[in-house]
């Protein structure tokens, strides 16, 4: 698959989707995107900047949602233009899709909406690559149906049908907790789409702080190393210069100062794993 000018797949180095969870200010977006561009360029990691103009599924109605579509897209467009990096953001309704698609390179669907057929079809017909997140409630094998909906919709419009990614972000494990079943990364390959591991939302504790979600960012390195060892096309990882002051998902964000060291580890593992064929491909009887 070709994504933002680079090739992605299990025979290529992993790519990174990263940035602050939500657009907080123009300066923060520029600073974080600039630093991530420096780090990934030095490590040879294809990079897509991510941030949300609106967090439509916050735990509480009083939580910060973002600057809104108009201002948020203006800031994301500036990052894209001034820093010359591709940009990804999420859409939350069919009405938003045509507008957002004009300002970013990649669209993303929220995990909660992966079963909404009309929404998935509308995103697929945007003409943009789409990172489709697996719902916390969904079996990994069921992502085949989600991806197929997207492909069918794209083909109906005469659009490429090989521009969709399947993203794992953890599975609900009782109340206020998620677990990552690493088998899901291999199972989701059966979609025929590149698989992305969301390392930061996978350590989220949904609603764990009453009016907001908690998180265990100390496990981001653990799970991201495991995912790279399984073999994935990409890694999604939110970051912030000061997670304690982040306006959304701070408890599971990677401190920006630690991104370089973590990515260095992941690059080392990725090179070892992808240097040889994956053994599981030969284990069928």
From Swiss-Prot:
It catalyses: D-arabinose 5-phosphate + phosphoenolpyruvate + H2O = 3-deoxy-alpha-D-manno-2-octulosonate-8-phosphate + phosphate. GO terms for molecular function: 3-deoxy-8-phosphooctulonate synthase activity. Gene3D superfamilies: Aldolase class I. Pathway: Carbohydrate biosynthesis; 3-deoxy-D-manno-octulosonate biosynthesis; 3-deoxy-D-manno-octulosonate from D-ribulose 5-phosphate: step 2/3; Bacterial outer membrane biogenesis; lipopolysaccharide biosynthesis. Keywords: Cytoplasm, Lipopolysaccharide biosynthesis, Transferase. It comes from the Bacteria. Its main location: cytoplasm. It holds the Pfam family DAHP_synth_1. InterPro entries: Aldolase_TIM (IPR013785), DAHP1/KDSA (IPR006218), KDO8P_synthase (IPR006269). It is found in: Cytoplasm. One of its GO terms (cellular component) is cytoplasm. GO terms for biological process: keto-3-deoxy-D-manno-octulosonic acid biosynthetic process. Its EC number is 2.5.1.55. Belongs to the KdsA family. This is 2-dehydro-3-deoxyphosphooctonate aldolase. It comes from Methylibium petroleiphilum (strain ATCC BAA-1232 / LMG 22953 / PM1).
């Amino acid at each position: 698959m070709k994504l933002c000018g680079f090739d992605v797949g299990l025979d290529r180095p992993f790519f990174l989707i990263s940035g602050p969870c939500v657009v907080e200010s123009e300066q923060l977006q520029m600073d974080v995107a600039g630093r991530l561009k420096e780090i990934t360029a030095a490590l040879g990691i294809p990079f897509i900047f991510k941030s949300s103009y609106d967090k439509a599924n916050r735990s509480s109605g009083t939580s910060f949602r973002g600057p809104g579509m108009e201002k948020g897209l203006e800031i994301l467009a500036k990052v894209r233009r001034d820093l010359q990096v591709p940009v990804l953001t999420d859409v939350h309704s069919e009405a938003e899709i045509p507008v957002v698609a004009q300002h970013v390179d990649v669209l993303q669907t929220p995990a909660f909406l992966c079963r909404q057929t009309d929404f998935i079809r509308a995103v697929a017909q945007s003409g943009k690559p789409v990172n489709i997140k697996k719902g916390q409630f969904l079996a990994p094998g069921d992502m085949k149906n989600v991806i197929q909906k997207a492909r069918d919709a794209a083909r109906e419009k005469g659009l490429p049908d090989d521009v969709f990614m399947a993203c794992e972000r953890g599975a609900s494990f009782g109340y206020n907790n998620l677990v990552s079943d690493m088998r899901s990364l291999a199972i989701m390959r059966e979609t025929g789409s590149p698989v992305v591991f969301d390392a930061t939302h996978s350590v989220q504790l949904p609603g764990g702080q009453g009016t907001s979600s908690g998180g265990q960012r100390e496990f981001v390195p653990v799970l991201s190393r495991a995912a790279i060892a399984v073999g994935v096309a990409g890694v999604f990882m939110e970051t912030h210069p000061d997670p304690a002051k982040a306006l959304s998902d701070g408890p599971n964000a990677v401190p920006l100062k630690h991104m370089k060291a973590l990515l260095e580890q992941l690059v080392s593992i990725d090179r070892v794993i992808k240097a040889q064929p994956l053994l599981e491909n030969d284990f069928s009887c």
